[in-house]
Amino acid sequence: MTKKRFTLIARVSTDNRRAIKNALEELFAKRSITSTDEGFLVEVTMHGDSARELNRSLLSALRRAERKTRLRSEWKSGGTTERFFDYVLKGSRKA
């Protein structure tokens, strides 16, 4: 399968902000991470086979740092947007 380019906009919330901030900084450039009242906002571009696989990999990495981490994400590629809450696909739409 060909690697696709995805644009990610994600809201990450957790009880342990320090652990998640460190995990996010290991995964992404600091300039793509913004601190919010609820946690963090992440805006990056990633390459992978599918939004589902990228989302699963990201949430698994974050939960290794802090188990009680929540991820609300939107993955955009090729005119399609897929929304996830944690590991669950909540919707998909064509642009």
What are these regions (language model features)?
Residues 1-95:
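Long, contiguous binding/interaction regions
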